[in-house]
Amino acid sequence: MAVSAKIEIYTWSTCPFCMRALALLKRKGVEFQEYCIDGDNEAREAMAARANGKRSLPQIFIDDQHIGGCDDIYALDGAGKLDPLLHS
């Protein structure tokens, strides 16, 4: 099954939750676009606008659908719902 979903993740370089979410995506073997927004307030505002006002990191989007943060993507994976999204 080929990965065709567009995956985007907003991160902060020293954020442990960001590192954990990135590790999951790497384990899944999927390609993703990472936006490291360290100290970039404009980028953070743009992310928050896409993420229903959420400013915490990471924020993850699959095919422009807001997934949430680290706990959210791991919950989807644990429920068996992440792979279908990644391979949509």
Curated annotation (Swiss-Prot):
GO terms for molecular function: glutathione disulfide oxidoreductase activity. Transmembrane segments: none annotated. It comes from the Bacteria. Coiled coil: none annotated. Disulfide bonds join C15-C18. It holds the Pfam family Glutaredoxin. Keywords: Disulfide bond, Electron transport, Redox-active center, Transport. Signal peptide: none annotated. GO terms for biological process: cell redox homeostasis; cellular response to oxidative stress. One of its GO terms (cellular component) is cytoplasm. Has a glutathione-disulfide oxidoreductase activity in the presence of NADPH and glutathione reductase. Reduces low molecular weight disulfides and proteins. Belongs to the glutaredoxin family. This is Probable glutaredoxin ssr2061. It comes from Synechocystis sp. (strain ATCC 27184 / PCC 6803 / Kazusa).
